Amino acid sequence: MTNARILIVEDEAITVSALKRELASLGYEVAATASTTDEALNAVELHKPDLVLMDITLAGNLNGIVGAVAIRGNYHVPVVFLTAHADDQTMERAVTAGAFGYVLKPFSGAGLKAAIETALHKHQTEIENRRAPDRAA
């Protein structure tokens, strides 16, 4: 789904710059950027992105796991985690938070695109499945 609007939540400026360049080259629009979970929640409300790319380890009081739970619960926007931590415990926490996928840092364009497209497709399928009972009634 090219042209998808993506919110980047990352507290390392160099990673934000790299993500912006890569997302643009892949045909995505960067809706906004945020560096904390609080900023991310405000940005989701304001910019209504199609997907959130969120670092698990963020500055501030709330980490990306907590942010993802709030975003999924309140806004029903898919979250794909960015992480340098591929250990089992971190991945389990990401799955429990309702993540639609994850991208390991340093990321590749192909890996980023695959994670985004998979998450968007999975999210669209969820929406269609929620509507299915309405059509049967």
Regions found by a protein language model. Give the residues of each.
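Short amphipathic alpha-helix used as the core "switch/output" element in two-component signaling
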Residues: 42, 62-77
